[in-house]
Amino acid sequence: MARKKVDKPVKEMLVIFVEGDADEIIINRLLDHYRSNGWKYESDIKLKNTHGFPDEKKIKAYLTTIIETMSEKIIKFKAVCCEYDTDVFEKGTKQRPDWEKIGNNLRDNYGVNEFCRIEAKTSIEDWMLDDSEGLLKVLHLPLNTNIKGMSGQDKVKSLFRKKNIMYDRSKGKSTIKKYLDNLDISKIANNRKVELKDFENILGVKNNDE
């Protein structure tokens, strides 16, 4: 007697790629901020820190790993989002990827329903400085401290340096997390609405001004 075919359960998933530890902390805090304001997401969310620019090769490798390690289920990628700093493109040190082509490839090869980019302009440190007062407070620096630096990253590094703390945005989670966790994330969410628009649309976040 033929064995009855058992259909695999379907697991829907949103995958978010970030390029460093600081980015991972901030994006996770944004998700918590949305949840605290009543947002719910029915599918699983996986956040992958690629410790470097989340290019197509890294994206595909991780999606493949998910499929292979969860082979007992049918994985449906509701969306894939990539977060990265824009400074490398603005400086001309890196060529902009063909994001439309990447999105189409992910759709064709992995069934990704939606693809979006979260561009941190000019860097995730610029986002952090949206609450410069909070950063000064958590570092126990005077609120009138002159924040020096040519870029957001330089400015944040200089503030941590004043307290003899090594700021490593890529692999320094154990050191920087307690400081970034004390920033007022609502200031970032409100000040970066343009950069977060597509991300929030995919998440289904409802804004008070809508």
Question: What does each of the following model-derived ranges do?
Answer:
Residues 2-14, 24-50, 64-210:
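C-terminal accessory helical subdomains adjacent to catalytic cores in phosphodiester-
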Residues 16-18:
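Short hydrophobic beta-strand that contains or immediately precedes a catalytic carboxylate
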